[in-house]
Amino acid sequence: HQVGIQGGVELSTRTLEQNLRLLARAPLLSAPGERFNYSLAIDVLGAVLERVTGMPLPQLFVEWVARPLGLGNTAFYAADAANLATPYYNTPQGPQRMHEGLRLALPEEMAGGEVLFSPARALNAGAYPSGGAGMVGDADDVLRLVEALRSGGQDMLRPDTVALLHSPHVGAQAQTQGPGWGFGFGGALLVDADAAQTPQQAGTLTWGGVYGHSWFFDPQAQLSVVILTNTAFEGMCGRYPQQIRDAVYAAEMG
């Protein structure tokens, strides 16, 4: 942000190409592979897809993902504000309603830094399509997507690509979920359940979003779980998703 780069959850005043030109000129935070940090890498991949296919990213999403999976309520912006949940954020005094330009510090265990929020971006059809953080949807659609990944990609992905989702690619510096976790191409990957002190089994893939959602799928247990809240950051990395996780496994174990 010090060089004016914009992310997928803040007010967008540039095109994707303009934003990535700024990114290309920004100095590296560290040498590649030295440490984990958030980036616009997935936005870059979205731009690569546009160049390779000659199609805009929203059209790619519809043709490659939404239509095959039957996702009817997920897009890069919401056409109707009435369909959006009101976003809140945690404070010591209880949840407070978000406002434009709100800055929140990320938890230290998530590499620190801060998030600049723009709830109005979800209604801005002119905002650039952010592959990393720029979409809205509902629980049914997210669950369909997560379940498709758990079951092997449902013909959207090649078997070797699916295998990359389930392989750790970064060392201990990327243990954003704590000990026992690695990082695959799809998010945090559980490597050692005992070290992580979780009922989930090795191979579980999980991630979340700063507005307050979390998801995971456990291939061994044949479980896909989606937790959507409207509260940052509790719904992403607070006690609530941990309690839901534990309740799900307690019910499964009977």
Model regions and ranges:
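Short, surface-exposed loop or secondary-structure junction motifs
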Residues: H1-P199
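Extracellular/periplasmic catalytic domains that process cell-envelope and extracellular macromolecules
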Residues: S30, F217-P219
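Solvent-exposed loop/turn segments at secondary-structure junctions
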Residues: I42-D43, T231-F233
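Short, surface-exposed charged micro-motifs
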Residues: G186, S214-F216
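Short, hydrophobic/aromatic-rich segments at coil-to-beta transitions
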Residues: P199-L205
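Short, small/polar residue-rich loop motifs at catalytic or cofactor-binding pockets
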Residues: G209-Y211
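Short, well-ordered beta-strand elements
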Residues: W215, Q222-T231
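Generic C-terminus detector
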Residues: A232-G254
